[in-house]
C-alpha cells in the first residue's frame, strides 16, 4: 500500500473506532462504507482497508455480502474479556512499576489530569477514552511490545461496551478517577504489589458493575448494549 493510501486508511480506522467507542454506531448496527467515505472525503478503498483492520481487532464482523456491523458482545465474550483484562493489565501495572521513570510518571499524571478534567465536566465519553489512554501508556511503559499489543487487542474489545456500562452506572466514573490516581502513585513509588492489587480491584469492580447492569436489565444471555445507552 502506498504511503498516501496507508495514511487515509489509518485515518478512516480511527474515525470508525471513535464512532464505535463513543456510541455513534451501536452494537449490531451496520457500518456504512459510503457514509464514512463521504464524511472523510475519501474513496471507498481506504475505508475497506480500515474495516478489514477493525474486523481483525474484533470490533466489527462481516454481515453476509453487504458489509460490516459493529460486534455485539455475548455474555461469554464479556467473561473472556474481563479475564483477559485482569491478566494483561495486572502484568502491565506491575512491570511498569519496575520499569517506568520520572518522565513516564509526568505523562501518567498528565493523562490522569486530562481524564479528571473530562470527569469534572461530565463528559463520560472523553473521560473513559482518556482513562483507557492512561492504561495504554502504562502498558507502553513496560517496554514489552508484545504485552503492549496484547493490551491494545483487549482494550479494543473493552471499548465496545465500556461506555454503555459507564452511562448506565455514571457514579462509577468517580471511583475510576480515584483508582487511577492511586494506581499512578503506586507506580511512582515502585510498589508493584500495590499496583497489582489496585488493578485487580478495578477490574473486579468493573466486572461487578457489568453483572449488576445485566441484572437491572433482566438479561442473562446477550447484553444488548444499544438498550443501555439511552
Positions of predicted regions on the chain:
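Short helix-capping/hinge motifs at transmembrane helix termini and TM-loop junctions
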Residues: 97-98, 143, 167
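Short linear motifs at protein or domain termini
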Residues: 1-94, 98, 211-230
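Mobile beta-alpha loop/short-helix "lid" or hinge segments that flank ligand
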Residues: 56-61, 152-157, 171-174
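A short secondary-structure junction motif
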Residues: 19, 23, 154-161, 165, ...
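Conserved amphipathic alpha-helical segments that form helical-bundle/coiled-coil interaction surfaces
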Residues: 81, 102-163, 177-186, 194-206
Amino acid at each position: 500500500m502506498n504511503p498516501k493510501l496507508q495514511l487515509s486508511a489509518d485515518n478512516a480506522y480511527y474515525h470508525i473506532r471513535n464512532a464505535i467507542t463513543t456510541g455513534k454506531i451501536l452494537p449490531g448496527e451496520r457500518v456504512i462504507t459510503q457514509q464514512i467515505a463521504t464524511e472523510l472525503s475519501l474513496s471507498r478503498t481506504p475505508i475497506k482497508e480500515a474495516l478489514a483492520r477493525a474486523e481483525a481487532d474484533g470490533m466489527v464482523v462481516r454481515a453476509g455480502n453487504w458489509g460490516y456491523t459493529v460486534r455485539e458482545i455475548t455474555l461469554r465474550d464479556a467473561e473472556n474479556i474481563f479475564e483477559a483484562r485482569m491478566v494483561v493489565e495486572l502484568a502491565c501495572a506491575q512491570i511498569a512499576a519496575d520499569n517506568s521513570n520520572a518522565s513516564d510518571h509526568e505523562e501518567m499524571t498528565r493523562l490522569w489530569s486530562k481524564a479528571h478534567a473530562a470527569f469534572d465536566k461530565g463528559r463520560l465519553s472523553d473521560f473513559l477514552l482518556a482513562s483507557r489512554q492512561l492504561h495504554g501508556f502504562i502498558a507502553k511503559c513496560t517496554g514489552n511490545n508484545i504485552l503492549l499489543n496484547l493490551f491494545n487487542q483487549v482494550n479494543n474489545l473493552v471499548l465496545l461496551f465500556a461506555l454503555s456500562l459507564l452511562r448506565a452506572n455514571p457514579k462509577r466514573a468517580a471511583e475510576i478517577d480515584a483508582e487511577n490516581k492511586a494506581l499512578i502513585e503506586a507506580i511512582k513509588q515502585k510498589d508493584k504489589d500495590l499496583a497489582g492489587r489496585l488493578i485487580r480491584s478495578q477490574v473486579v469492580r468493573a466486572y461487578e458493575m457489568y453483572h449488576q447492569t445485566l441484572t437491572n436489565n433482566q438479561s442473562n444471555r446477550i447484553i444488548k448494549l444499544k438498550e443501555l445507552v439511552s
